[in-house]
């Protein structure tokens, strides 16, 4: 991954098995966020990115989401002018398209993990605290029932007790 003349990530190879958790640790500017964005096709990269044996280089972020790949970006990227519950349901957009059942049950599971979101389900996302927005971003990702979940700075703004739960 390059930013002009600066090479942010070089010679990186990752392999993640089903059910496995991998952590990228490094100082600011080491390329952790760039790596996640490169995997999701949000930043151009050289080399190859494959998932379940398929090359992803020419895929759109939307098609990757439909394959079950979800990124919770560092800056949350919520729909600030929409209510909490609407943000959560947008996380399940591809499931709506497939007419999947169980969305309400999954919403209740997210509310059980983050009770504060249920209390504030009619509140505009942009008016919430940073920690509440982080809960919402993670909850929205979980609504997609991801096969591959990429979390960039997942504990940002969260209380230590909630970090332990996640």
Where are these regions (language model features)?
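Glycine-rich phosphate-binding loops of nucleotide-dependent enzymes
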Residues: 1-166
